[in-house]
Structures are given as structure tokens and as C-alpha cells.
Amino acid sequence: MITAEAASESTVPAVPGDTAATGVPEHEELVWPWKDAPIRELVQRIHQLQAERAQAFRRLEEGHRQYLSSGPPYDFPRYRSTVHEVTQVFAAASREVLAVEAELAGPRAQPLLASHVRSLQQLEETRLTTVALLQLMGTPELTGQEDSLQMHQLKMKVIKTMEAISEVLQDLRFDAESAE
């Protein structure tokens, strides 16, 4: 159940410190900066978010390499910190991608574009899960237990997922141009 207090926490004050006669801060809904943007700008934003995700994946890979080369004893707290930072980047990108999808599916009435964005999100989730599993399998604690065939299959899955992401991004760009 959503309480009045929880509901008030989901909005932002209209003017910081501004209160009505009742002493309750005035609130307005969060304003999404892309709400009235043309479709091509939404698509550009998706591409920007993909670039941010790519950078986060590079940071995750680098963090994992540093972890593996740090020991023994291994510097797990540093790696955990990197994973936490990267997770925040992925979560923020996912929230915004889902907001673009909702905008395209709802007010913009662009179900094809929305489906591309949904596919992109699902592929990125698959990629992240697979990369995380690969990193887990490559940890020193599991050295000697890894299955080289399974590792190869997971690496191929990452490659195929990345190819599918590229295709979806191309389809999104092409179909967005047709929609305008």
C-alpha cells in the first residue's frame, strides 16, 4: 500500500523550501527532459545511452582484469566497488530506455519503435547476465572448475547478442526515419 508519505517522496518540490499555508511542501511531478522531443532526438538519446552502456561494459571488463591480476590476495573490495558503480550506470540507462519505450508506445503511438526499444533492453539484460556469468566462471576461486566448452559458448552468446543489439539499433534508426 502506498502511503501519503511514500507518495510525497516520489515527487520533487516545485520550489525548494516553499510551503503552503498548511506547512506541507508543494510538489510537482518529475519532468522528463525528452517528453516533447522529436522522435529522432529520442532515437539519438537511445544511441547515447548505448554508448554509456558500452563504456560501462569496458569499465566492468577492466575492473575484472584488475581483480584477476591483483593477487593473491585478491582485491575483492575494489572489484565490488567497480561492479557497484557499473550497476548504477546500467540501472540509470535502463530506467531511461524504459521511459523512451513508454513514450513511444503511449503518447507517440509508435508501437514498432517501442518494440525495437524493448528488444534492445532485453538484449542488454541478456548481455549483462552473460558477461557476469563469464566473469564469475573466471574467478580464481573457480579456477580449474571452469568448463572450457561452456566458457566458449557463453563468449559466443555475448558476441551474438552484441550483433543482435547492432541490428536492433539499425532497425530503430531506419524505422524512426520512416516514422517522421
Swiss-Prot record:
InterPro entries: REX1-B
Superkingdom of the source species: Eukaryota
A Pfam cross-reference name: DNA_repr_REX1B
Residues covered by region (Disordered): 1-23
Protein name: Required for excision 1-B domain-containing protein
Annotated organism of origin: Bos taurus
Source organism phylogeny: Eukaryota, Metazoa, Chordata, Craniata, Vertebrata
